[in-house]
Amino acid sequence: MSALSTLRHTFVYIMLFVALSWPVQAYALSIGEERLIGQKILYSVRKDLRILDDPDINQYINRLGSQVLQVVGPQYFDYRFFVVQSDQFNAFAAPAGLVFFYSGLIEAMRKEDELVSVLAHEIGHVTSRHLAQRMDKGTKVSAASLLLGLAGLALGVPGLSQGLFTGSLAAGQTINLRYSREDEEQADRLSFGWMQEMQRNPESMQDMLRTMRRITRYRMGNVPQYLLTHPNPEARLDYVESLLELHSQQSSAWTKTDNFDFLRFRYRVLVQTTDLDRLRQYCAITLAQDKDADTQRMARFGLALIDAQNRRFDQALEQLALVQGQYPDRNILRVDQAVILQMAGRFNEAKAILDASVHRDPTDMYGLFKLAQVEAASGNTTRAEVLLQQVARAMPEYPQVFFELGQIEANRGASGKGMFYLGKYYLYQGQEDLAVQNLRRARRDTSVPKHMQEEAEQILAELEHINKET
């Protein structure tokens, strides 16, 4: 064994001993307080950032999170995972199990294990309650101040309220909330162990940290060190490389991940968040030069999405047909085909494909939602409503499903029910004033069913409580 390897092994053993010897932390936040702050932060994020509220993207990232949580074990919080439009290379965990990934980070990834490594790292911060530990036990810090501090960590995100950022500096919370080196090492150590349990390749942690180091070096001149949510990637990289050396004999147990779902998810994100001409150029280069078969094939999928966005539907369908030929058993590609047909106004063809696809996989909320839209556009509003209610039960914070339900009720002349659904749409879009306005009207409308009036009252009370407490 080399002297460097011996030194790294010794370092890891020392750090593990120190970690086990750390005293139990005193938390400034109770579980209930953390949940309340999480609710407020989510409302604020919806207001100031653009969350990709797409059932396809949402379902993938949350399924992946659930896979990690299965090995993590019981938790205090119900975790939720979101993709936010931003070219920043970042992800952050907020209180109460809210985890946000920037589209710029996803763009830099090349395989699913890299996404899992970051996802597990953020879960490590939440399950260790690092934010609660960062609080000063002797000082009463409001949820609003904590919110400002978290907002300050999201430096450089287009659309982030300048008032929030300025306030976070004035409140002095940004420095207090910075993760320590020990926090980062604990999150990396937990992530490493969970990936091993999942038989995922933890070398992906090393790959992501190398990318982070390169990007941090490039951007360091513009971003103060104390504002980085994950400081010092060099030290983290050394620590993870030490763990990899320590467990190198277990590398044969790591399974090769099928990256189809990840690559499809990645292109679905990028086509909504990046310049299409630049993305087309990237896809063309990948198609011509990449040696990995899946990466090369799915670059054509990216080209199909770009053509569809540019309303070149025939070319999009031709590109997608080539991808389907490479993956004949992937039902989700049939849904993608139907969506392009729907965009082209070919509703009968889209409906036939979506009916068959949903029958094969009734858990696919993306397919269900698109089928509901096709049914509504074809005048079959009764079935559309049934399908939309299924989606609403599975994804109760997806704004567009309530917009579609509101449209159906408004077209029927049921204005009260339409206002109720419109209120929920605005609520999950982050437009609180409009949400309150419509929910109050629905609550007072005697034509609105009692259970809807009660739900409107409950939402209004919850909003009042959150605003009062924070």
Regions found by a protein language model. Name each.
Residues 140-158, 163-175:
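Membrane-active amphipathic alpha-helices enriched in small hydrophobic residues
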Residues 100, 114-122, 126, 166:
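Short alpha-helical catalytic segment bearing the HExxH-like zincin motif
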Residues 27, 39, 51-53, 59, ...:
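Extracytoplasmic and endomembrane cell-envelope/extracellular-matrix remodeling and assembly machinery
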Residues 103-117, 179-182:
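Short pre-active-site segment immediately N-terminal to the catalytic Zn-binding motif
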Residues 113, 123-140:
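Catalytic Zn2+-binding segment of zinc metalloproteases
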